[in-house]
Amino acid sequence: MLFAKSGTVLTISRFACAAYRRNTNFIRIPTTVIGLIDASVSIKVGVNYANYKNRLGAYHAPIHTFLDFGFLRTLPTAQIRNGFAELIKISSCAHLPTFDLLDKYAEKLIDTAFGHADGAEQEVKDASDRINRAGIHEMLKLETPNLHEIGLDRVIAYGHT
């Protein structure tokens, strides 16, 4: 199955793949900042149930993940801000140089969909590339040793309840 979406639709679709025949293959193409930076490296497919976050779920990796940051130009500003907040969390916990870039280019990154809107300055595009690569790299460093979340003391869980 091929899923080109982020958020709830992607999560529920991935959960369905994990449940159907206990492992239906899927390819994911995340389309939001959070999807590209965070969900793209995670194998957790959890859904909320009975007022509990991620109460139902599984750990099921895709056979491929395609990252196309061009999707960001299609997002409303509120979605860009949500992803920006996730990058602030990751960088403040794990990578100060990225945090400094986010601070320096904050408004320009939000106004230009992370440098992907028409007319974005090359400097902003370059900063966006560095930020996004660093965000993914840090997520991989933090997730890889604990893919199945056996250890609950996770830096990237900062702010989660």
Predicted regions located by residue number:
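Anion-binding (especially nucleotide phosphate/pyrophosphate-binding) glycine-rich loop
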Residues: 1-23
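Hydrophobic aliphatic residue packing
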Residues: 7-9, 29, 47, 143
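A glycine/threonine-rich phosphate-anchoring loop and its flanking beta-alpha core
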Residues: 15-111
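Short, flexible coil/turn micro-motifs enriched in small/turn-prone residues
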Residues: 2, 9, 34-37, 52, ...
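Generic hydrophobic-segment detector
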Residues: 3-4, 36, 58, 125, ...
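Active-site segments that bind and position negatively charged phosphate/pyrophosphate groups
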Residues: 110-161
